[in-house]
């Protein structure tokens, strides 16, 4: 019997939704670090900022896994806490110096990879087989 997570994965595999999820997972850490390089932010603020900056095309509803991973690798740190008007604790995160270095590498790798993909997609068909 398949587990619930496997069933969900099977449902989106090979679909545009599945592709979008894979792309989001691959870029989430980079986007979090990009925002935190500008100023300390709390998680919900990051989600809203990404949604706004992408004109609603990117909606990262769960950044927590990426944030925990970035914190474990000491690329970000908890900066301070404040109480919101709704009596919720907001934990602000900031980027570390190692996080800045990691962000530069991520951006370089991302740009190199996406440029290579763009070059492939510009290729006119028919392709001739390699010999």
Provide a role label for each language-model segment.
Residues 73-88:
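Beta-hairpin "wing" of winged helix-turn-helix
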Residues 67-71:
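Short, hydrophobic-biased segments on the C-terminal half of alpha helices
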Residues 20-64:
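N-terminal helix-turn-helix DNA-binding core of bacterial DNA-binding proteins
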Residues 1-31, 38, 88-89, 97, ...:
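Intrinsically disordered, low-complexity serine/threonine- and proline-rich regulatory segments
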Residues 20-22, 75, 127-128:
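Short, contiguous hydrophobic alpha-helices characteristic of membrane insertion segments
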Residues 100-131:
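Amphipathic alpha-helical dimerization/coiled-coil segments
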